[in-house]
């Protein structure tokens, strides 16, 4: 993710473990429906408690309500849904305070200085597990999946040579070839060899022009191989030529959403829809993500679908 600002963040907790996090723009005025919708989303995820954080805007010329007021409105909606409040935090500039802590020696009215995240234990654990630290802002987040410059014409020609025409006489053969290529490339990433075979990379990108190959690729990863496929789809997304981005961006969006990276998932869908504004899978995923489907429900749906796609190929 990225360091939020001018935001309201809601972290769902299920059986003592963080299950999902949601961020919305900081409310300009009271909107009961918006707070109820946030509470409803984490209720669907099975949350029994929540952590709320209000990153209060500092612009003096805007009619923003105080962090305490915004957190109070959200707390009412959560309690209506039988979700307990674990913590409620207001962040203004570089200071924070708990609005439910009554000990002024712990949480003075002026707040406490925010700790340096990059030198924290949490940051160290993230790096040790091979995960990137949160980006500075949403622009930097989007830049992390932006197209790389100077994609060579030879590579583009390679990709185009693997394009699958829907009326091809050997369509099923090319679909099987594409599915096999996805598996082979995934195994390279699992082995830590990444994109060491440029022709195989081009083959996967080109074959994903076929919907059956794309749907097969959408369901191929497991919990154990998620990190390898995350890296694979992210790298392919950045080097895919124009016209070949939408399938990969949609797959990466699904993987990001399953990993709890909702903001990144939406940015990936932005790339898909820039490449192909009417791309049906990207439009469907946008509706699913915006509706707040729990990642667990999305995973279950994908796992049920994959055997049928595999049988069709």
Indicate residue ranges for each PLM-predicted region.
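Charged, compositionally biased boundary regions
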Residues: 3-5, 19-313
